[in-house]
């Protein structure tokens, strides 16, 4: 193939901005781009390799001969070449001559497409030719209040959610066809995909990225992934991607020692490597690396229309001593352990994205108490608009794993989150990290026998949905997947043939739909205006009760019994006189419960918990119940008590009548462990098996 070098000089502005760390669309300049020069169609290639002695483009088109297509150094560290005749899907790499005169073959850091592992070459691709149909979705999102709207996220791994009969994963477009009806039926607002940026090792789940501008070819082409997003948006479902700017792998064809020396990684060995992960840390203080990473983040939002990025491993970026022993790290210039360059990068990245697209989401997976994560960079914050609440997750899973006999002594784990619940814009995450590496699935974390496990999990889900903050649940946990997640296998969908699993799925579906329809559960998530304790301190009986409010003051009463004991005539103060109607009860028979219900309960005049009124309810064992709250009755010259958003000082929970086991004839008398009569399967005449073989 005849070689034609580009005579055109690089545009001054993108190059200048790139070297300043401010080219946030560097992918438009670097990489491979189909174009025509001097009447000849082909592609222009550009790469940043500041230490290289020479660079050439190699591929099938020149039999991978390094001397066939040498590139021209056109600027400080930037190499360029136009090659006529190049077409879409052509495979290529850069052959780089290092300062030590060694040849290294590297994939294009800015490639839009790549070969499927174990092959690792880059592919030429034109992403601009896709015909989008989601303008209505995009316009609607610009008008939505992302902070004060409902958000229930379904986290999934694209390759193992569901597979074809032959065990092959669906491609992106096929996956969308399977996923859309399920997500709509289940009531989720968003899906969050584990990383789909190209990666070499299946076992990393995508968290060791080799291609920051290429959706993994495991599941199809870039256009296939665009179609995935387009189909979900058409169905009213948002798409969030996991994005990994914290570190990258050492694979020889990737970013590691890209041109024979530290290029993308920090050159200081005490800052530039995560030894426990076997990965390299980006040099966040290098302007060209800043341009690369911010461009990647904006690329997925602007070119693939995704609705947000969940930024992985933020804590590892913030602290120089993260997972490092004494002597393995160095202080910053101020004598502290904070990574000042990483902080500045995160602030720049978030400001760039949310400045352009304020309706999008930047979500931090940050596991420490770092302050102001979701406050603007201009105010000293990191600039995210959401943060995973890892403290809540750890406390609640620890509490739920505890035998109910010992929960009284751990009651603070249920209530402690409210000391900081409104300090950040939190997402409550029950993610993939909690159901792998011997941690057990969520259902298997629950104590007790088969029935009790499901009752515990329903109680937890009801509490989680009512707790302030947006929601996230990993795939399979909505129907009680018993075994841990394995990225090589699809979920155990056959479990839905068993009553308890189908009933749990029905409960999660009803919770999601109720949540979306009930503004008090999401409209004021990040202020005491939207929450008020009624019973925070009944640790002896493991009961809590609280109110949620929407922006207009409409309330929902939530009561949780974390003990497997029936509580009859349980009294609690309520804000308004009138009838309190039971709306959702996790112990409902249709959810697999024992059927203890309240129906409607009328308030009784008499002070309790700072209110003038109180009610008496029956609390099923291991249950969460939602009650409607009647509107306040206006009294001339005398405002109703307890209508302020400030939480009234709670009194000790009133002792209910002596706990007792109900008479056998009453439906409410069934203990938790008692199995209800077998039900007929939904679409079959034979009775569903009651108990599948489970992993202990």
Language model features: what each stretch is:
Residues 48-55, 575-578:
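Short proline/glycine-enriched turn/loop motifs at strand-loop junctions of beta-rich domains
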Residues 305-307, 322-488, 495, 516-587, ...:
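Conserved alpha/beta catalytic core and glycan-binding cleft of carbohydrate-active enzymes
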Residues 88-92, 599-635:
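C-terminal beta-strand-rich structural cap/linker in extracellular carbohydrate-active enzymes
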Residues 115, 135-148, 157-338, 617:
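Substrate-binding/active-site clefts of carbohydrate-active enzymes
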Residues 47, 94, 156, 183, ...:
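Conserved, mostly hydrophobic/aromatic
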Residues 41-45:
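Structural beta-strand segments of beta-rich domains
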Residues 1-40, 72-155, 160-167, 174, ...:
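The feature marks proteins involved in alpha-glucan
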Residues 633-696:
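Intrinsically disordered, polybasic Lys/Arg-rich low-complexity tracts
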């Amino acid at each position: 193939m005849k070689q034609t070098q580009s005579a055109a000089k690089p545009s001054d502005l993108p190059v200048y901005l790139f070297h300043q760390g401010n080219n946030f669309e560097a992918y438009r300049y670097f990489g491979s781009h189909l174009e025509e020069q001097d009447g000849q169609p082909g592609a222009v290639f550009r790469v940043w390799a500041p230490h290289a002695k020479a660079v050439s483009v190699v591929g099938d088109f020149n039999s991978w001969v390094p001397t066939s297509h040498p590139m021209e150094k056109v600027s400080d560290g930037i190499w360029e070449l136009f090659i006529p005749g190049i077409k879409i899907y052509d495979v290529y790499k850069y052959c780089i001559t290092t300062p030590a005169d060694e040849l290294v073959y590297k994939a294009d850091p800015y490639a839009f497409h790549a070969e499927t592992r174990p092959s690792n070459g880059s592919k030429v691709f034109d992403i601009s030719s896709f015909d989008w149909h989601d303008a209505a979705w995009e316009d609607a999102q610009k008008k939505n209040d992302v902070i004060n709207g409902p958000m229930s996220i379904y986290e999934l791994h694209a390759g193992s959610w569901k597979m074809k009969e032959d065990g092959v994963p669906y491609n992106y477009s096929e996956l969308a066809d399977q996923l859309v009806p399920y997500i709509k039926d289940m009531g989720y607002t968003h899906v969050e995909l584990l990383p789909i940026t190209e990666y070499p090792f299946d076992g990393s789940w995508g968290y060791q990225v080799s291609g920051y501008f290429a959706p993994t070819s495991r599941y199809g082409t870039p256009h296939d992934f665009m179609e995935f997003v387009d189909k979900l948006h058409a169905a009213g479902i948002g798409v969030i991607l996991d994005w990994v700017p914290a570190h990258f792998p050492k694979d020889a064809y990737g970013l590691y020692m890209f041109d024979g020396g530290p290029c993308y990684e920090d050159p200081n060995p005490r800052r530039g490597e995560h030894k426990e992960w076997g990965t390299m840390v980006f040099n966040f203080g290098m302007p060209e690396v800043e341009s690369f990473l911010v461009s990647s983040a904006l690329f997925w939002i602007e070119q693939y229309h995704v609705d947000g990025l969940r930024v992985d491993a933020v804590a590892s970026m913030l602290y120089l001593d993260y997972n490092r022993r004494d002597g393995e790290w160095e202080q910053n210039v101020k004598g502290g352990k904070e990574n000042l360059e990483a902080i500045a990068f995160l602030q720049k990245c978030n400001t760039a994205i949310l400045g352009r697209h304020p309706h999008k989401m930047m979500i931090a997976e940050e596991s420490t108490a770092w302050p102001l994560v979701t406050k603007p960079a201009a105010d000293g914050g990191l600039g995210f608009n959401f943060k995973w609440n890892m403290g809540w997750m750890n406390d609640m899973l620890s509490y739920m794993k505890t035998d109910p006999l010992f929960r009284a002594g751990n009651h603070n784990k249920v209530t402690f989150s409210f000391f900081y619940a409104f300090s950040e814009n939190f997402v409550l995450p029950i993610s993939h990290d909690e159901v792998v590496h011997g941690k057990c699935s969520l259902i298997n974390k629950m104590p007790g026998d088969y029935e009790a496990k499901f009752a515990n999990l329903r109680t937890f889900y009801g509490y989680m949905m009512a707790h302030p903050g947006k929601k996230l649940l990993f795939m399979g946990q909505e129907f009680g997947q018993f075994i841990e997640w394995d990225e090589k296998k699809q979920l155990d969908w056959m479990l839905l043939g068993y009553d308890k699993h189908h009933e749990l799925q029905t409960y999660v579906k009803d919770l999601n739909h109720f949540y979306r329809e009930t503004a008090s559960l999401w409209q004021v998530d990040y202020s005491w205006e939207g929450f008020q304790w009624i019973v925070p301190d009944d640790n002896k009986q493991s009961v809590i009760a609280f109110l949620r409010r929407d922006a207009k003051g409409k309330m929902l009463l939530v009561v949780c019994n974390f003990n497997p004991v029936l509580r009859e005539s349980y009294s609690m103060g309520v804000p308004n006189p009138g009838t309190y109607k039971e709306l959702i009860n996790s112990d409902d028979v249709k959810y697999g419960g024992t059927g203890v219900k309240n129906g409607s309960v009328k308030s009784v005049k008499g002070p309790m918990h700072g209110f003038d009124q109180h009610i008496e309810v029956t609390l099923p064992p291991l249950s969460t119940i939602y009650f409607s709250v009647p509107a306040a009755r206006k009294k001339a010259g005398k405002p109703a008590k307890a209508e302020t958003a400030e939480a009234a000082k709670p009194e000790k929970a009133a002792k209910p009548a002596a706990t007792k086991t109900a008479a056998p004839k009453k439906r409410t008398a069934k203990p938790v462990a008692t199995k209800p009569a077998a039900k007929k399967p939904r679409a079959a005449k034979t009775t569903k098996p009651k108990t599948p073989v489970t992993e202990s």
